[in-house]
Amino acid sequence: MKTLLRVLSLVAAVAGLLSAGAQTPAGRAASDFDFAVDVVERAYAGYPDKTANRGAEYAALKERLQQEIASGRDTYDAVAEYLGWFDDSHLGTEGVRAYRPKSIRRPSDYAARMERYYPQFTHCRVDRETYLIRFPSCDPDWISLGEVREMIEKYLASGCENLILDIRGNGGGNDSSYEPLLRLLYDHEGVEDGMEYRVSDLAIAHVRKFAGDTERGRAKIARMERTPAGEFLAGESKTYRIRYDSVSPRPRRAALLIDGKVGSSGEQLVLEVRACSRRTTVYGQDNTLGCLDFSNCEILRFPQDTTRWMMLPTTRSCRVAEGRGIDAAGIAPDVRITLPLPETLTDNVDEWVRWVAEDLKTEN
């Protein structure tokens, strides 16, 4: 959730170095499989839930992969299969999608099905009543809070009653990036699920990195250091409130437009909008990616080949323990769009946006 797209940018950069990693001697590389297993078992927030009632299957997987590595299988391909078994889009390495059941079961390759799929930040009038804000990333390196507020100011100055917030392609970043948009759509106090850390050295390092200079962060670190490794940190609030001191009179009606690439912080935006905005309807054809139950990721380099990486979530949503996780199926839209995919999605006003604009006018 937090900082995911920045992490993925690092991943892309690291991936460009993989050819050098292919030269790692097989005997040394094999220990990187053991490294992956160790860090998953002691630090991955999803490990207890993903292995529950599947202990024999998990043990057999590890044994088979170790035997295949000993027989000459590429170590890092085996690591990809190992991580893919957990079926978590936040737990990954190069090549994991080929083994992750969800990626195989629910492909969302819009680029292959459309003439051009490259959603870009844009804002413009759709028609006399409707304004479009396209917000395809929560990465603060891609868009600043000032730029987000400027888009909102342009919308309010337009005089349009209705708003389409198009987040197709938004794979995440940082939750704070969308806060001005959430404030704009807010019309009542809402409650959303919190998250909890699975205590480990990596989780402590994560808190220290992002909140270690705050009193609250230091207090959390102290409690984590008193908690046995592998347990979830007790005493955390299971929910949090979404509350602002005022409600914007516009938009009168709003649409949140999603697709199967929306994940992580993008999905958090969907959940928070649903929790606090009755005037907003979620539109889409596909469910979202389903990449939010386990989050707050750390990037790790393999000790034997430091050009290779793995990404690991340190927190679990409190909804998981209650059986309300979203990762298996993603978040469904309120209204399913049955139109064909648009030919192009860049900075244009596409067919879906025009259809949604008309539908907003017909709502009671």
List the predicted regions and their residue ranges.
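Hydrophobic h-region of N-terminal signal peptides that target proteins for export
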Residues: 9-21
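Mature hydrolase/peptidase catalytic cores and their serpin-fold inhibitory cores, especially
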Residues: 226-242, 251, 262, 286-287
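Sec-dependent signal peptide recognition
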Residues: 2-10
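Short, conserved, surface-exposed binding loops centered on an aromatic residue
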Residues: 243-249, 272
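Flexible, low-complexity junctional segments that flank or bridge functional domains
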Residues: 22-223, 238-239, 250-255, 276-280, ...
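Non-catalytic, well-ordered alpha-helical segments in soluble enzyme domains
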Residues: 266-279
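A recognition module on extended beta-rich or small alphabeta surfaces enriched in W/G with H and D/E
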Residues: 318-338
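Active-site neighborhood of thiol-dependent amide/isopeptide-bond enzymes
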Residues: 255-266, 283, 291
